[in-house]
Amino acid sequence: MQIKEQLRQLKPYQPGKPIEEVKMEYGLEKVVKLASNENPFGCSQAAKDALHQEIEQLALYPDGYSAALRTRLSEHLQVSESSIIFGNGSDELVQIICRSLLNDQANTITAAPTFPQYRHNAVIEGAEVREVPLRSDGAHDLDRMLEAIDGETKIIWVCNPNNPTGTYTSEQELIAFLNRVPEHILVVLDEAYYEYVTAEDYPESIPLLKQYPNVMILRTFSKAYGLAALRVGYGIADEALIRQIEPAREPFNTSRIGQASALAALDDQTFIQECVEKNKAGLKQYYDFAETHGLTCYPSQTNFVLIDFNRPADELFQALLEKGYIVRSGQALGFPTALRITVGTKEQNEEILTILAEIL
């Protein structure tokens, strides 16, 4: 068999060690995972209740149109139902977009470092990936991204807030950027951490869709909504664009349980606000720690923080792992002396920071 040449350039996704495996390997009774930016407070009770109500329907295929969730989400976002596309997590939407727009004659532009699935899926389609280094403040260098555009550019990815730095592009910066991007190029605003943002000058992106039909917004129920296991993401864009890329979407790509739980979670905004407030307090714990120990820390608009410890990240990762804390080493993220740490509960944050202080 002849596998695509570009697949030989890629490695399959390597998930972190399962919690149970870490317990067995290091003889631990408790392991805390602060590596994947999951919600440490779980999900809304309403989402759990909705999940249980769907259990009797598991023999039936889900609604391929996600009609009930689509209607409620369109009301929540104040957009038309036909301007929404659902994905098996927003990861699948990245795949759908690349499959729809890219080929071996095209190129796509991303920041570096940023969410790696943009590059991964573009390479599979045979496209050239043009990576533009982040600015010194960890944010996208939009001017240099504009300079990278040519006649074969099809997609520009703006991860906002950016993963792994947690930094963001302001509304003023974004609008100035969009005004200079040719209309035939799709600009994808990946807002996976949208609900956690507190910056006053963060873009209100949905109203921009009327002026910029070449913009698509990606969001997810995996982060603040705490439904990572159920894989429900969505995209918002001009109705014509959604119609054009819908054929690349699998027919039943979101489950009955996922749709029902996401709908219920959407209606519990009190839970989201509580999580956002706890996250703000948690971020302050990390900021204070970084200041006390003279460490560099990017201000974050997400539920994670990237701290530069000025020593090999893999060594710190291993030291924490042996103590029962799983974080993300910056080695594979483009920051070889930093750790990306998910903001946990107050107690989890205190525990890991105590361990880090001892190591330092």
UniProtKB/Swiss-Prot annotation:
User: What Enzyme Commission number does this protein have?
Assistant: 2.6.1.9
Classification via NCBIfam families: hisC
Pfam families found in the cross-reference section: Aminotran_1_2
Q: Which residues carry this modification: N6-(pyridoxal phosphate)lysine?
A: K223
The GO terms this record gives for MF are: histidinol-phosphate transaminase activity; pyridoxal phosphate binding
Protein name, per record: Histidinol-phosphate aminotransferase
Quaternary structure, from the entry: Homodimer.
The record's listing under HAMAP family reads: HisC_aminotrans_2 (MF_01023)
Q: Which organism is it from?
A: Bacillus velezensis (strain DSM 23117 / BGSC 10A6 / LMG 26770 / FZB42)
Family matches, as InterPro entries? Aminotrans_II_pyridoxalP_BS, Aminotransferase_I/II_large, HisP_aminotrans, HistidinolP_aminotransfase, PyrdxlP-dep_Trfase, PyrdxlP-dep_Trfase_major, PyrdxlP-dep_Trfase_small
Q: Which cofactor does it need?
A: pyridoxal 5'-phosphate
